Amino acid sequence: MTLALAAGTFTASAGHAELRTGPAVATDSAVYVERSSSAASRRLEPASRLARGDRVVTIVTWVRAAGTGGFVITNPVPTALAYQQSAEDMQEVSVDGGRSWGRIGALRIGNRLATPDDVTHVRWRIPPQSAARGRGQITYSGIVR
């Protein structure tokens, strides 16, 4: 099954960043699909079409134009994507639409532990020392449902 998700459409869904503090920060997202030509060879290609089971990598680039201190970036995970992991250890996830936050392995849905498939939002706290650099990237991966 092929999902008709052009990179621009998918990027727009994944690229909405919510800033919880006052600094002027701009974000942009790019979506790539991971391709394997052998067990040891993997490469990223811009995502123009995605199919169920494709592993995608979303790169969120942020640029700080003004302000001091740290800030928070929140991204909704598209419903067509099952969250897998973030390349940064400073992420928190939500499994309830952004109402509560924590780490996989600590969050619960009813009587069970939440899994990466349950993630609805990803949030990164950018500390003051990283924010002072003025720009950065955050990467997370997922599987197309």
Q: Where are the predicted features?
A:
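Exported/extracytosolic protein signature
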Residues: 10-145
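Bacterial N-terminal signal peptides
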Residues: 1-9
